[in-house]
Amino acid sequence: MTLTQLLQDKPPVRHDVQDRADIRNALSTKGQKLVVVDDDPTGTQTVHGIRVYMDWSIDTLLQALTRPDEVFYISTNSRALPPPEMRALTHELGANLLAASRKLAGETGKNVRLLLASRSDSTLRGHFPEEIDALLSGYGLEADGVILAPALFEAGRYTIDDIHWVDLGDRVVPAAETEFALDPAFGYTKSNLKEWVEEKTKGRWKAEQVLSLSLQTLRLGGVPAAFEILSQAKGGGAHRDQCGHLRGPGNSRSCLDAGGRTGETVRLPMRRLLRESSGWICG
């Protein structure tokens, strides 16, 4: 099967300039910063004009938070680490982000809302869900759900009808049928992301608990329709929101809302983003 055949019955791509403008405006006017935690150095190759930090000391993070940049990356290379070391590193990073934001508030009175994004591999390899758990724990945040959005259009990785696909040139195949799924550290057997979540979490989150944003919903209903579905995600991590075919530049993402006032944990419907498409986003 080709990508064209796979998409032939789908609605046309939705290009809503106003939606993008609203997102940028919200970041710039509401004191929000998107912090992308990147588990592999190759991830920064998909962005430009963005600062990338190689350490996450409180002083470095404080400098990053005081700059006018709306987005910055932190490169950890945690994908190359064994699980215990990854958890310690990611927990420390989350704790330092919280400490830096509190220090900024104490010294300047400025409260910054952090949108934490975890970026990982577009072929579903990485420390999922352990890395998200460690980041949340370090930051002291509970999540109502996770948005899993694996994709990297430039390399031919797409999510359509809940299935993650890899373009091999002459055809597209489910990700679990590729060599990537045989990775000795991060192997998997499921291409349906609902089932993949259950597999990777060892049943902690069941496939039937996963909500799905279809191309039809995104392209025909837009933001209001997506928000209605995402708002159903409640329960401190017991539910998960999986976004089909969502992508911006570079890999996969997950996002969490890190709270309204510095140091507070605020429960919102859409709280944490995972990391596929080479990333997750937590905010």
Question: Where in this protein do the model-derived segments appear?
Answer:
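N-terminal basic/disordered segments at the start of proteins
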Residues: 2-68, 154
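Cap/lid and interdomain-hinge subdomains that line or gate substrate/regulatory clefts
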Residues: 24-33, 38, 61, 68-70, ...
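Short, glycine/acidic-enriched capping/hinge loops at junctions between secondary-structure elements
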Residues: 45-50, 64, 83-87, 252-253, ...
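Hydrophobic alpha-helical membrane context
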Residues: 51, 131-133, 254
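Short loop/turn segments at strand-loop or loop-helix junctions that form parts
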Residues: 74-79, 271
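Acidic, glycine-rich loop-and-beta core segments that form the ion-binding/anion-interacting portion
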Residues: 254-283
